[in-house]
Every structure is written in structure tokens, then in C-alpha cells.
Regions:
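N-terminal glycine-/serine-/threonine-rich beta1-alpha1-beta2 phosphate-ribose binding loop
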Residues: 1-98
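Glycine-rich phosphate-binding loop at the start of an alpha helix
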Residues: 101-102
Length: 102
């Protein structure tokens, strides 16, 4: 069975963390992108579990570097740019408040 690409918006919150736990045991989805406001300090640990991640987005950061990630999106339009570059991926929105509606 071909795995579906998945983008996880809001990886640092409780819904995002529960999703990451579930994805570790799942063979239907391949996590290819994660997004958060500013929680950059968690990325390396997530990359250890999900080396399939090629895209990371932070709407609240203006600079971030990580040699393990192919595509890094920053700023106000970071989430939209990541979605546009990963056409066809399933999007799981775990963002809270108004950020989840934008």
C-alpha cells in the first residue's frame, strides 16, 4: 500500500504530540512536514523519529537553520508556503485559536 504524505500543523501542542505518538505506529501515513509557531527546540528529536520529514515551518520565527531539513519556511506565510510546496499531502491541523483558521 502506498503511504500518504502528511503535514502536521501544530506539532508542539498536546494534539500534535499525541499525533506524533500515533504516527510512530502507523504505516498508512508518512510525515513529511511539521509546523509550529516557535518551538524549534523540539525539531531534532522529532527528526530522529521521523527522518522522512523534508519541510519545517515556523510562523513566529524570522531565522532558523537545520542541515537535516531540506525546506524551511519562516514568517507570516510559512504555513501556506509549506502547504503549496507539498501539494497532495494530507493536512492535520492541530493549531489552536485563530492560527488554526488562517
Amino acid at each position: 500500500m502506498m503511504r500518504k504524505n502528511l503535514l502536521l500543523m501544530g506539532f508542539s501542542g498536546s494534539i500534535g504530540k499525541q499525533t506524533l505518538d500515533l504516527l510512530k505506529e502507523d504505516d498508512e501515513y508518512e510525515l513529511v512536514g511539521i509546523a509550529a509557531n516557535t518551538s524549534y527546540y523540539e525539531v531534532d528529536q522529532i527528526l530522529d523519529s521521523f527522518p522522512s520529514i523534508t519541510s519545517v515551518a515556523f510562523s513566529g520565527l524570522s531565522s532558523y537553520e537545520n542541515s537535516r531539513v531540506k525546506n524551511i519556511y519562516l514568517g507570516d506565510n510559512a504555513l501556506l508556503k509549506m502547504i503549496e510546496d507539498n501539494k497532495g499531502a494530507v493536512i492535520l491541523n492541530a493549531l489552536v485559536g485563530i492560527a488554526g483558521l488562517a
